Amino acid sequence: MNKNGIPRRKLLDFAALIAATGLSLLAFAQFSQAQIPASSGSALQAASSKTSAEKAYQFQNTMMDAYASGSTVRLAQSYSDQALGATAFTYDNAVAIDAYLLRESHDDVARAEVLGNGLIYAQATNFPFNDGRFAQAYFVNTLAPDGSGAYITPAGFPFYFYGSAVGDQAWAGMALAQLYRRTHQQQYLTAALKVANWIVANTYNTLGPGGYSFGSVINQFNQSVPSPNGKSTEHNIDTYAFFSMLAEITHNGNAANGASWSSLAQHALDFVLAMYNPAGGYFYTGTLGDQVTINPFPIPEDCQDWSYLALLNNNYANTIDWALANLQTTDTAASPHSSLTGSEKITGIVFDTASLSTNPAAYPFADPTAVWLEGTAHSVAALIARIMVGRGSPSRFKDLETVEFFVNNSETAQSEFGAGQTVNGMPIPVGEGLVASTSVMDTGFGYTYGPSLHIGATGWYLIGLQGGNPFQLGYRSLRP
């Protein structure tokens, strides 16, 4: 058994599968670390992926060290300066922690701990409430005024990213739980339990199929009020995975309200399964604001791929195929408002069904064929998980081919996008990070993505390349 807990027999099966299809992935090399011989063509592909991963990690380091370095408590800026300035999104930093912990070098683990300490500081000093929640984002370009030496301050004007969506809380909690498992440092578990208890106390919902509501927003009077949004399938997937981790770490311990973490995880799962459309083979996005009525449009990618990563249940494996069939696109220079030029073309996944039919009145410069590189990496991770869980399935060969195809397209995007972008005014080398999307992309939820270098997209690319699963404690899609 290797250090990730994957039985060597299963690794050898995966190696044989790769050899049979003529493919080679950094994912397998990172999983096994067994240096199993491959064909010369496969070896070249593996070397390319390894180089791509090393460059991607360098981008993550650049973004993390833009304003401070070493052990200074901080979070990493999410996008290049050209997008949202020195803003660090809580979710993006959780993904960055996962990517660092997956590679497991001494420096990577140290960086994950620094970001984890940043989350702990952000939680303890969160404005305007420090009751265990995290804000959506923070500013990371100035010293905090409290003398702590941390580079984390509230993300006020002009964005006011003070709200606390349940998905962001769960992602921060999962990253902290993973840090606790890796380091056994109590402060990470303490912070994870604080945010978990905030979720339970503030969003546990009994309307309709139950689950957890969207979260809280901060109004103009700096008061915390429930979000008017409907319940989110994605948020409940995240919460199910997070509370399942806590059940394992605490040996099925209880939340502050006395309920077991496993029962609280089941409450989220009940909602998720109620959102499944068996006729269509996909999960709905969630409910409308009444917390009961299913919201039929748009249908997002993350619910399809993340549900499999969280559940590892082949009864719902077809949701991956639904996303591939209905959310795959190719961005070319001929596409409306594309940022591509010449003969460039990138194939991958979009955010949701609304992305393919953009609203010209709201977003006149959106490209209906823009590729969401983070979502493409979600699909890579889900496909690798399906290969590992259902290794006897004939579809594993097709899944591997799709993985290699998406990885190749992502490597192309990595090498060609992001020229002229900066962090803290300093140029970011071309060919390291991945942009959020190849062109401006309408999500259908009132915001867009664009071709700005992004630690979230890059972090998920690294997770996918290494076959990681952040919804499972220890990142394993297989249990020993």
Question: Residue spans of the language-model regions?
Answer:
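Non-membrane alpha-helical segments in proteins
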Residues: 92-102, 114-118, 171-175
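Bacterial N-terminal signal peptides
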Residues: 16-27
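N-terminal secretory signal peptides and thylakoid transit peptides that target proteins
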Residues: 2-18
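Extended ligand-binding clefts on enzyme/binding-domain cores
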Residues: 39-79, 86-91, 121-157, 163-167, ...
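Alpha-helix exit/C-cap motif
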Residues: 99-104, 175-178, 182, 245, ...
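Boundary at the C-terminal end of the N-terminal hydrophobic targeting segment
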Residues: 29-34
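N-terminal glycine-rich cofactor-binding segment that shapes the pocket for flavin-like pterin cofactors
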Residues: 163-171, 175, 179
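Alpha-helical support elements that line or immediately flank enzyme active sites
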Residues: 99-106, 304-305, 311
